[in-house]
Amino acid sequence: MFRRKIYDKLLEWKTESDGRTALLIEGARRVGKSTVVEEFAKNEYESYILIDFSRASKAVKELFEDISDLDYLFLQLQLQYKVDLHERRSLIIFDEVQQCPLARQAIKALVADHRYDYVETGSLISIKRNVKDILIPSEERKISMYPMDHEEFLWAVGDTTTIPLLKKVFDSGKPVGAQIHRKLMRDFRLYMLVGGMPQAVNEYIETNNFRKVDQIKRDILNLYEDDFKKIDPTGKLSSLFDAIPAQLNKNASRYQVSSVLNGERAENILESIAELKDSKTVLVSYHANDPNAGMSNNKDLGKFKLFLSDTGLFTTLMFKDRDFTENIIYEKLLNDKLSANLGYLYKNAVAQILTANGDALFYHTFMNESTRRNYEIDFILARKNKVCPIEVKSSGYKTHASLDAFSRKFSDRILDKYLIYTKDFAKDEDIFCLPIYLVQFL
């Protein structure tokens, strides 16, 4: 199993909660939820039962229709799974709990009983049909699990030293030098291409074959498409999802739903975006109408951009119209030799990094009065009651007209300004020019 940062959060929950809450881990399909939870169960408990509700028998699911006799429930589970449960020393895992809403509702009584600990995993947790007619337990602590971040990817390929050293570089505010920078950029581009889905990472490690890695990612994308069709048989969710790379490549000030779904009503659009967001396959960046430390209070729900939650899946979706993404394309991307403008690939990677760091995504556009075109700040972070605007480029050019205009307009609100680009660390007056591999330290 790959080392995952969320394991430490599981340990923290076990110690702090002492069985007073269940832990609900939300995440997209195939990010590794079940794997890490089962590893946690093996290492930290005397015994455990894992109930995979996507495969559980009808008899097991029916046990949760009447939980008035918990002694009977636990006896039946031990018989079904041939596992002895020990009071306060065993864990029961509800895997894919969205497939059995009554099991999720039972958490209230199970936690109050306090005999065992409970971890739930799921995707599409809040979709209407998955919470219909059940009482959502208040005894849940929710955490999100994302694809492997850059550091977890490096751990997987046997590198435990680069990130701690990069943190020192970031803190020092000095460049690393041309030779080391080239290697760091190539390594980061490798992460952007493979991504953080454990199956794809494992395939890369075992075969070093981009075509096989790409097929794994296509299989995952097809799985997501199947999930979308179960939620929305009309195919609208799938269309919105598939269009994400093209929409970002347009460089428009928002995701233009009308160019994907003609004549769709506003309330239907908002519901579709909420469902995509709930699937954890998509990251939503909202327009901050008034950029300040409280941007969540003034975001425009109707003006947004969509990103994929995994940079590797994004790379594959970019070339979805081909039978497979040829090795030559991967090689050119890896060596920074592809002539296409890849700004949207870099922006998607930055969105993923910021989300993994726990930041909500916001951006801001405003009119350039002389050209009548928009300035755009790609991302805005809230820090210390101020904001940090970020502009992202896929080149090494230190041009930053949008940052400069934003600075003039909101000078009293800004803590730090960042230009993310492909060159080594530099300072351009009061702007920090950072290579993309340092974004994780913002």
Each PLM stretch: what is its role?
Residues 158-346, 360, 367:
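Interdomain hinge/linker elements that couple catalytic modules in large macromolecular machines
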Residues 25:
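Hydrophobic anchor at the beta1->P-loop junction of P-loop NTPases
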Residues 109, 126-142, 154-159:
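Short regulatory helix/loop adjacent to the ATP-binding pocket of P-loop NTPases
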Residues 5, 14-15, 21, 30, ...:
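A cross-kingdom feature that marks ATP-driven nucleic-acid transaction machinery
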Residues 42-59:
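Conserved catalytic segments around the Walker B and adjacent sensor/switch elements
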Residues 93, 117-123, 144:
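Structural recognition of the conserved hydrophobic beta-strand(s) that form the central parallel beta-sheet
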Residues 33:
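Conserved lysine of the Walker
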Residues 55-88:
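Short glycine-rich substrate-engagement loop in P-loop NTPases that contacts/grips substrate
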